[in-house]
From Swiss-Prot:
Source organism, top-level taxon: Bacteria
Domain PDZ: 186-269
Membrane spanning stretches: 172-194, 309-331, 352-374, 401-420
Record-annotated active site: 22
GO biological process, one term: proteolysis
Binding-site residues, Zn(2+): 21, 25
Name this polypeptide is given: Putative zinc metalloprotease SAV1262
Claim: Hydrolase is one of the keywords in the record: yes
Keywords: Cell membrane, Hydrolase, Membrane, Metal-binding, Metalloprotease, Protease, Transmembrane, Transmembrane helix, Zinc
Cell compartment(s), UniProt: Cell membrane
CDD domains: cpPDZ_EcRseP-like, S2P-M50_PDZ_RseP-like
Length: 428
């Protein structure tokens, strides 16, 4: 049963993170007028799909990412060229609405035509000889029109609906929006947790066994007001003061039953592993703070949690990248879907609150990792846009596509190696 819960939790976490990321791309793409033929969650074979307006929404088998397919985002060419024989369906204005490429269709009242001239980007027309009268005719293509092949519809994208022909700014927004939406999701989750759990105060809720707070006689309800020479008004002040006094003997003042008392104690030094490449030294008294529920503090606390998490993950990513050049790199520094599944399994056992917190951190991680300047990732593609903005011309399309393809192959190889390493670490 626990495996089933973990699998469901993993699917939900993966689905939410990828959906939010890809929706960010699609939201800004559509605002820029870019046609998005497909919105996919997962990779590989399609297991579910539905069409809404001009976009086909699909769920695919492999939980290793997702994508938004945008018109003009590649070297694809229209499947029709002069000399071909196709069938066309016309609307009441005698405009082409469907260009049928084979016999796998259910359309009626269609015309066969031998294409002599055509333009699917600017002037939108087909000129050719129709079978019914063997005469040459010129047909306009409707703004909303489709290629039909094997029963599937692919909407025709004029030049002004293509990603490649947009200005650098809407391109940048479209590419950056995926990570941006991951950051927004993380911030919302952190703030939501702060509202649900309350924000920590400097009042003692519970003391830990064999820690300085217990040994000094601190009790539930004691409100810490000063550590050494540092005034305390909220829980963050406790951490800041302890970072300064470290493990030196110090005086702690607190309020109990309306009276101010003081004790001397020595904070305990602890080492906490943050990531596979970094750890944190903290000095603690050993108490759990009481929480309070207010209107505005959770917003500030959630934002602070987001900044701390983002700083931690950014530092870890920079450290990982640096280790490639210093010789300290290990695949243990990375987690693929298998590693994330293992982490979700551990987090689920701690409860839904821990799972939400992990999802928030994972969302930050996804956003930051996607901004690494590798050609197949958002960060690499943003570099192409920056080049275009600086030099007032886009990178050669064929060169860009080749570089992105090489980057994609590199990412696939890395994903395979990381997945095998995760399987070896956690299950073998």
């Amino acid at each position: 049963m626990s495996y089933l819960v973990t699998i469901i939790a993993f699917i939900i976490v993966f689905g939410v993170l990828v959906t939010v990321h890809e929706y960010g791309h699609m939201f800004f793409a559509k605002r820029a007028g870019i046609m998005c033929p497909e919105f996919a969650i997962g990779m590989g074979p399609k297991i579910f799909s539905f069409r809404k307006n001009e976009t086909l929404y699909t769920i695919r088998l492999l939980p290793v990412g997702g994508y938004v397919r945008m018109a003009g985002d590649g070297l694809e060419e229209p499947p029709v060229e002069p000399g071909m024989n196709v069938k066309i369906k016309l609307n009441e204005e005698n405009e082409i609405t469907h260009i049928i490429l084979d016999d796998h269709h259910k359309f009626q009242q269609i015309e066969a035509i031998e294409v002599k001239k055509c333009d699917f980007k600017d002037d939108l027309f087909i000129e050719g000889i129709t079978a019914y009268d063997n005469e040459r005719h010129h047909f306009k293509i409707a703004r909303k029109s489709f290629f039909v092949e094997n029963g599937s519809l692919v909407q025709i994208a004029p030049r002004d609906r293509q990603f490649a022909h947009k200005k650098p700014w809407p391109k940048f927004l479209t590419l950056f929006a995926g990570p941006l939406f991951n950051f927004i999701l993380a911030l919302v989750l952190f703030i939501g947790l702060a509202y649900y759990q309350g924000t920590p105060t400097s009042t003692v809720e519970q003391v830990a066994d064999k820690y300085p707070a217990q040994q000094a006689g601190l009790q539930k309800g004691d409100k810490i007001v000063q550590i050494g020479k540092y005034k305390i008004s909220e829980f963050d002040d406790v951490d800041k003061a302890l970072d300064k006094v470290k493990d030196n003997k110090t005086t702690v003042k607190f309020e109990r039953d309306g009276k101010t008392k003081s004790v001397e104690l020595t904070p305990k030094k602890t080492e906490r592993k943050l990531t596979k490449v970094s750890s944190e030294t903290k000095y603690v008294l050993g108490f759990q703070p009481a929480s309070e529920h207010t209107l505005f503090k959770p917003i500030v606390y959630g934002f602070e949690s987001f900044l701390k998490g983002s700083t931690l993950i950014f530092t870890a990513v920079v450290g990982m990248l640096a280790s490639i050049f210093t010789g300290g790199f290990s695949f243990d520094m990375l987690n693929g879907p298998v590693g994330i599944y293992h982490n979700v399994d551990s987090v689920v056992k701690a409860g839904i609150i821990s799972l939400i917190g992990y999802t928030a951190l994972l969302s930050v991680n996804l956003g930051i990792m996607n901004l690494i300047p590798i050609p197949a990732l958002d960060g690499g593609r943003i570099l192409f846009v920056i080049y275009e903005a600086i030099f007032r011309k886009p990178v050669n399309k064929k060169a860009e596509t080749t570089i992105i393809a090489i980057g994609a192959i590199f990412m696939v190889v890395i994903m395979i190696l990381v997945t095998w390493n995760d399987i070896r670490r956690y299950f073998l």
